[in-house]
UniProtKB/Swiss-Prot annotation:
Active-site residues per Swiss-Prot or TrEMBL entry: 257 (proton acceptor)
Family to which this protein belongs: Belongs to the transferase hexapeptide repeat family. LpxD subfamily.
Record's keyword terms, sorted: Acyltransferase, Lipid A biosynthesis, Lipid biosynthesis, Lipid metabolism, Repeat, Transferase
Pfam families: Hexapep, LpxD
SUPFAM superfamilies reported in the protein's UniProt record: Trimeric LpxA-like enzymes (SSF51161)
Swiss-Prot/TrEMBL GO biological process terms: lipid A biosynthetic process
Gene3D superfamilies, per database record: Hexapeptide repeat proteins, MurE/MurF, N-terminal domain
Protein name listed in UniProt: UDP-3-O-acylglucosamine N-acyltransferase
EC number of this enzyme: 2.3.1.191
MF (Gene Ontology): N-acyltransferase activity
EC category name: transferase
């Protein structure tokens, strides 16, 4: 549940404003001036809270909720209790997310941990760095020579911005994150401990030893990207590593040199993408997916968690398994193996 000690909800949001934002009419008799002071799960929501429901497994909780209002899809609307106002929308979760953004504005983007305004004592900004008005720098952060940082951007404690790095406006760079050899767009969120722009893993291997290949490319991060804690993105070897507009990357992801990730991709925790692979727009990689190098995963494809991708994936595909293959083939193989294993166990007197 939300705790006002950490995140304070915005005052002044009313039931009428909620309905207007969702594009749904209020039921007859509902008071549009009623304040909405929080958001909570169905089970714990109180008489001034907003809740949502879009999964049948929570039907019992819906029937007993005490929420002021609940965002529901049309098929669940009849199950909303009499004391709760049903706000009927085709996509309750998306509507709920939008309303949370209005109610908890400060949770949308990490701010200064020390309520800094300008450069804090204890931070070090090189005289040749260029910071626009409105940049906030927490204690311990370091900004190298030639770096450029746009207005509204926040650097957390002990963040390191290397020489000549460019960061756009309204970004958030988490505590302990490091950025080198990188160009970062606007409204980018980089969470604590992320490592951006370090050497890619490149060696010319041979019997006499392994010769390091200089990594002379960059990392390009476009607008509205979010990068999770302790994720690592290596700079390119001779071309750039690119993360496309609107892409969301979870914690603990490794992206190797020369990887190109398209627009609005989703990459879940534990993924590893080997060098020179391309993800086209709107690709989704489930948790702990491994992708071999020099591949192309087509637009809109989805890869199931813990899969290993070792060949190109056509656009619009749904693949899974090790090695990854179309999900119908994967399921059929798993079912066949399960039946064979069961039959074998019975034949051996184990069934």
């Amino acid at each position: 549940m939300s705790d006002p000690v950490f995140i304070v909800p915005k005052a002044g949001l009313t039931l009428g404003a909620v309905a207007e934002a969702c594009g749904v009419p209020l039921p007859e008799g509902a008071d549009p001036s009623q304040p909405v002071t929080g958001a909570a799960p169905l089970e714990t929501a109180g008489p001034s809270d907003l809740a949502y429901m879009d999964n049948a497994r929570y039907g019992d909780a819906l029937g007993t909720t005490r929420a002021l209002a609940c965002l529901v899809s049309p098929r669940f609307a009849p199950r909303v209790p009499a004391g709760t106002i049903a706000l009927v929308t085709r996509d309750p979760y998306r509507a709920y997310a939008g309303l949370l953004a209005r109610l908890y504005e400060e949770a949308m983007r990490p701010g200064s941990l020390f309520a800094a305004s300008g450069v804090s004592p204890g931070a070090h900004v090189h005289p040749q760095a260029r910071l626009e008005d409105g940049v906030r720098v927490d204690p311990g952060a370091v900004v190298g020579p030639g770096a450029e940082i746009g207005s509204g951007t926040v650097l957390g404690p002990n963040a390191v911005i290397g020489p000549n790095v460019r960061i756009g406006r309204d970004c958030s760079i988490g505590s302990g994150a490091t950025l080198t050899h990188a160009l970062v767009g606007n409204r980018v969120i980089i969470h604590p401990g992320a490592r951006i722009g370090q050497d890619g893993f490149g060696f010319a291997m041979g019997a006499g030893g392994h010769i390091k290949v200089p990594q002379v490319g960059r990392v390009i991060i476009q607008d509205d990207v979010e990068i999770g804690a302790n994720t690592t993105i290596d700079r390119g070897a001779s071309r750039d590593t690119v993360v496309g507009e609107g892409t969301k990357i979870d914690n603990l992801v490794q992206i190797a040199h020369n990887v190109v990730i398209g627009r609005h991709c989703v990459i879940v925790s534990g993924v590893g993408i080997s060098g020179s692979t391309t993800l086209e727009d709107y690709v989704v990689l489930g948790g702990q997916v491994g992708v071999v190098g020099h591949l192309r995963i087509g637009m809109g494809s989805q890869i199931a968690g813990s899969s290993n991708v070792n060949r190109d994936v056509p656009p619009g595909s749904r693949w899974g398994g090790t090695p990854a293959k179309p999900v119908r083939t994967w399921f059929r193989e798993m079912t066949t193996l399960a039946r064979l294993a069961e039959r074998g166990g019975k034949d051996d007197g184990e069934g």
